[in-house]
């Protein structure tokens, strides 16, 4: 990718970061996302506290109550967080200090071009980072780079938009949505589970676990708006009911139809010796 394109991408996320900071009040959906991510890590990563961990963007840590890296940071000091936006990194560092978490290794870089040594990371967490690229080729480049940075027997836990969700629209509609200014940020391409598995295997990783998480419809903004509207209308009296509703929807992960209802696909992939 050319230097100008990299700059434009960083500028876009800087703008999103400034808006996100102003418009990101705590919400139940974000609380639910954090809980789900931590549960997924507990299931798929046997963390001892000494692992070298990489998280591939810092958007939640900068602005959202769905952040979970600070929770990991209180147990381990060997965490690297990256983001293409200096605005997002600066805000993530401010919030990290409020949680007494070391942010000295929060780096500004593109996930496709990591300033990391090969075979250096024990665990890589990539939650909905790679579905913000304009092409599947960009996703493949990023996956190749993550595989390079991961050590042998290291684990990659990755989530992406689920294109087989019954409410996932054709990408033409997504483009129109963005042109109308209805999307808060750039919505990129994604991969099916089969496509993701194939690329990971080409890069020397085997998918040991897969699932679908967050069983609610597209787009996220509509779900958040509905939640906030109900909370405001009921003056908080529906908060418990909303939490119970999200917990009930989580049960769909145990159904055979989970890939039709899950908002994201999630995989655990392990790197093996060449």
Tell me the role of every PLM-derived stretch.
Residues 1-54, 157-179:
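Conserved class I S-adenosyl-L-methionine
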Residues 32, 179-195:
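Acceptor-substrate binding/catalytic loop of class I
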Residues 112-124:
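A short acidic, Gly/Pro-enriched loop at the edge of an enzyme's catalytic core
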Residues 123-137:
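A short SAM/SAH-binding and catalytic strip from SAM-dependent methyltransferases
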Residues 54-113:
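Class I SAM-dependent methyltransferase SAM/SAH-binding core
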Residues 140-152:
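A short glycine-rich, Lys/Arg-flanked "PGG" loop and its adjoining helix->strand segment in the class I
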């Amino acid at each position: 990718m050319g230097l100008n394109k990299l700059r434009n991408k960083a500028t876009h996320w800087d703008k999103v970061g400034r808006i996100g900071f102003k418009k990101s009040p705590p919400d139940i959906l974000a609380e639910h996302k954090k809980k789900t991510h931590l549960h997924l890590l507990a299931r798929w990563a046997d963390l001892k506290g000494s692992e070298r961990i990489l998280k591939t963007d810092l958007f939640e840590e900068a602005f959202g109550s769905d952040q979970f890296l600070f929770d990991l940071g209180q147990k381990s000091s060997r965490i690297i967080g990256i983001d293409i936006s200096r605005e997002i990194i600066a805000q993530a560092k401010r919030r990290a200090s409020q949680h007494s978490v070391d942010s000295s290794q929060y780096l500004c870089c593109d996930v496709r071009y990591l300033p990391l040594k090969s075979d250096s990371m024990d665990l890589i967490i990539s939650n909905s980072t790679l579905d913000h690229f304009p092409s599947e080729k960009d996703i493949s480049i990023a996956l190749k780079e993550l595989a390079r940075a991961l050590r042998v027997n290291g684990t990659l836990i990755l989530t992406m938009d689920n294109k087989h969700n019954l409410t996932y629209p054709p990408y033409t509609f997504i483009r129109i949505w963005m042109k109308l200014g209805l999307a808060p940020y750039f919505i990129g391409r994604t991969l099916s589970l089969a496509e993701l598995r194939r690329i990971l295997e080409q890069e020397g990783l085997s998918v040991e676990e897969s699932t679908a998480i967050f069983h609610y419809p597209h787009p996220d903004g509509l779900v958040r708006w509905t939640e906030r509207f109900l909370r405001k209308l009921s003056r908080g009296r529906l908060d418990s009911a909303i939490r119970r509703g999200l917990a009930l929807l989580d049960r769909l992960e145990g159904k055979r139809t989970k890939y039709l209802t899950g908002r994201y696909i999630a995989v655990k992939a392990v790197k093996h010796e060449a």
